[in-house]
Structures are given as C-alpha cells and as structure tokens.
Amino acid sequence: EQIADLAAYHSLFYSQSKVGHKPATGASYGLSDQDIPLRPLVKVHPVTQRPALFIGRHAYGIPGLSEAESEALLERLTAFACQPPRVFAHTWQPGDVVMWDNRCVLHRARPYDYAKPRVMRHVRVAGDPITEAGIIA
C-alpha cells in the first residue's frame, strides 16, 4: 500500500547507460521519437487481479522523490523481488523452451558463454497493447 500510488519513468537508454553503453546514431531501438513513459510501480494483473511490481532496470525517477530516494526505493523493491521463493533460474539444455507471463514477472538475462549461440523469440499472445504498456496519461 505504501507504493500503490507511486510511478517511475522507464527508459532503455537509462538502463543501458548504467552499464556503460552510449547511444549511437541510429541505435535508438525505435524509442527516440517517443516520450519516456511514466508507469506505476504496482500494476494489477488483468486476469488474476493480483498486484505485481512493475519495475526493473529500466525504471528510474519516481516523481515526488529525490534522485537518491528514488534509486534507493527501486533498489529495495528489486532486492525484495529477487529473493527466494520469488526466483526461478533455469538451467538451459538444448531444445528448451521457457515461457512466462510478462505482466507479472521481472526477468533478466544471466551471464552466459558468448561463444555459444542463443536463439530467442518474443511473442505477444494476449493482452491489450495500451493497458499492457501501463503508461500513465
């Protein structure tokens, strides 16, 4: 309830800059012509009606909080979300397929051997693009 009315900006450029990447000309990932979206920290799943944290490495800048307060709160929420029993780490085997509901899962890549090929596919199978984006008007 303490964070139910809070929101944060979400930007690929923000998350990439935190790990040392600099945006290059033409490397906007299709986002350069859009405003940075403001999304709620908590989003209610449209099917289960369960609240879920809507955070991740792209989230920053909670309106009403200082930069330091915003970063500290997001770090605490991420640390909470990424602890057992709320963590699944898949041990990949050839032929594996993993699917998840992006509306209620915080996911990230783990270190892997760059010399070995990886094939990934992203498919939206359900949901309204407007409400799924969680953008606050």
Question: What do the PLM-derived regions correspond to, one by one?
Answer:
Residues 1-97, 102-137:
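Non-heme Fe(II) oxygenase catalytic core, chiefly the N-lobe of the double-stranded beta-helix
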